[in-house]
């Protein structure tokens, strides 16, 4: 897992909280970006989700995953290395 991963999230989103917790528990390194505090990040999320601020959105290299499961993230990380 050498590819940098960014997790776009927002407060009070249970899906974001669950994915963040699973990633931390598994010790998967990632950068977490709160889209309510970072307008550029919010614009990125909208651009890959048809104008919606759908979170969690995960970026691995040039690939984006919208509301992925933990398994989907692990598979994407494995295939990117």
Q: Where are the regions a protein language model picked out?
A:
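Short secondary-structure transition/capping segments
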Residues: 1, 42-46
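Local sequence-structure signature of Cys/Sec-based thiol-disulfide redox active-site neighborhoods
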Residues: 1-29
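Structural micro-motif
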Residues: 49-57
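Non-catalytic, surface beta->alpha helical segment in thiol-disulfide oxidoreductase systems
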Residues: 60-81
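Alpha-helical elements of the RecA-like P-loop NTPase motor core of helicases
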Residues: 17, 21, 43, 75
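Glycine-/small-residue-rich active-site loops that bind phosphorylated ligands and cofactors
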Residues: 14, 37, 65
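Short amphipathic alpha-helix with an adjacent loop that forms part of the alpha/beta core around
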Residues: 45-49, 76-77
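Thiol-based oxidoreductase modules, predominantly thioredoxin-like and allied folds used
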Residues: 29-42, 52
């Amino acid at each position: 897992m050498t590819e940098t991963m960014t997790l776009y999230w927002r407060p009070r989103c249970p899906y974001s909280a669950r994915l963040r917790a699973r990633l931390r528990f598994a010790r998967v390194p990632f950068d977490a970006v709160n889209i309510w505090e970072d307008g550029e990040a919010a614009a990125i999320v909208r651009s890959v989700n048809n104008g919606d601020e759908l979170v969690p959105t995960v970026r691995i290299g040039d690939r984006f995953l919208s509301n992925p499961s933990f398994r989907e993230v692990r598979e994407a990380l494995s295939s990117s290395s």
